Amino acid sequence: MHAWPASEVPALPGQGRDLRIHDTATGGPVTLDPGPVARIYVCGITPYDATHMGHAATYNAFDLVQRVWLDTKRQVHYVQNVTDVDDPLLERAVRDGVDWTALAEQETALFREDMTALRMLPPQHYIGAVEAIPGIVPLVERLRDAGAAYELEGDVYFSVEADPHFGGVSHLDAATMRLLSAERGGDPDRPGKKNPLDPMLWMAAREGEPSWDGGTLGRGRPGWHIECVAIALDHLGMGFDVQGGGSDLAFPHHEMGASHAQALTGEFPMAKAYVHAGMVGLDGEKMSKSKGNLVFVSQLRREGVDPAAIRLTLLAHHYRSDWEWTDQVLQDALARLDRWRAAVSRPDGPPAEALVEEIREALANDLDSPAALAAVDRWAALQQESGGTDIGAPGVVSRAVDALLGVAL
């Protein structure tokens, strides 16, 4: 599966700063020091109802991570998956009377278009769950043969007790885990499981649903968590720098994925930092496919909204915050974009070197994009009020906003 085209990242004078970011697993900030090649895995979409603002906010956060690393002159090895076979996708295809593979392809193509328009840097490896199945099967077999998984009526479940570190990502109590498991694709009430929290690794073939050769597992399809584990281990190995996604993935998805990987390899941790973006709401509730309260990037683009304004709307909120999408936040972003473009359209202006350092400092401090935007606002206001004589300063600002924030002025 191919990703989307990369926009050019302008080179900036000076050197970026190491990223200090909130790690869900430790509950506090950690300073990331990846070495010459930074490794990041971000969980991708299930391809239906793409791309809503919750999606866009998540991928904006991890695009900023990449940009901070690139500014430190590191290479970035970025992997993202597509959950292109899953119960919600199959259910949507049945509801709409379409082939599930056609729906997945259509929505993945739309997602690529939206990411291109928003100037999100693409992953080097963009991997669908279906294409990863040949690598998933032997991992499930290994877990089963090692006693870390067991069969139940043809299905295969992971035993959470096989990982002594289970619970170390989300730090939730058992009752909360059980509740969230039921809400987020698990089956804690299924009779016969050793532990209600045990997640499915391999689902035996069901009538009328797609299935694949599972070797000694029999025909079926993989569980959600093992898909990401297989892709991450194949392309990044253990101990990569950042595992990213929305805050609703901390449990069960990232918790279970970490336990799968740690049980498979005997190594700890799967990722050095678990980073989670907040939720975007509409009309007082979290945007979600199940509720249908969605604002789509493609819809706004069709209405003629500049993608740079959409991106500024996302950047106006700290990535870990939960926030509400309203017409006003978009109007504020459009006005900000106009002010910035007017400010950089002049041939000279106030000196820009300090501004570049302010943006760098803000982003290195847990991706504080609102602080970065405020710094640019101050420069633009100074340009509007009194101007300046620094030839080329507007060009420096334009390149910095592009390179560090992904906004084309």
Swiss-Prot record:
One CC-aspect GO term = cytoplasm
Enzyme class per UniProt: ligase
Q: Which residues bind L-cysteinyl-5'-AMP?
A: 43-46, 58, 81-83, 224, 246-248, 280
Gene3D superfamilies (alphabetical) = Anticodon-binding domain of a subclass of class I aminoacyl-tRNA synthetases, HUPs
Q: Does the keyword Magnesium apply?
A: no
Tell me which CDD domains the record gives. Anticodon_Ia_Cys_like, CysRS_core
Q: Name one GO molecular function term.
A: ATP binding
Q: Catalytic activity annotated for this protein?
A: 1D-myo-inositol 2-amino-2-deoxy-alpha-D-glucopyranoside + L-cysteine + ATP = 1D-myo-inositol 2-(L-cysteinylamino)-2-deoxy-alpha-D-glucopyranoside + AMP + diphosphate + H(+)
Q: What is its EC number?
A: 6.3.1.13
What does the record give as the function of this protein? Answer: Catalyzes the ATP-dependent condensation of GlcN-Ins and L-cysteine to form L-Cys-GlcN-Ins.
The record's annotation in PANTHER family points to:
CYSTEINE--TRNA LIGASE, CYTOPLASMIC (PTHR10890:SF3), CYSTEINYL-TRNA SYNTHETASE (PTHR10890)
Q: Which NCBIfam families match?
A: mycothiol_MshC (TIGR03447)
Q: Give the record's subunit note.
A: Monomer.
Which protein, by its recorded name, is this?
L-cysteine:1D-myo-inositol 2-amino-2-deoxy-alpha-D-glucopyranoside ligase
Per the UniProt record, the source organism is Streptomyces coelicolor (strain ATCC BAA-471 / A3(2) / M145)
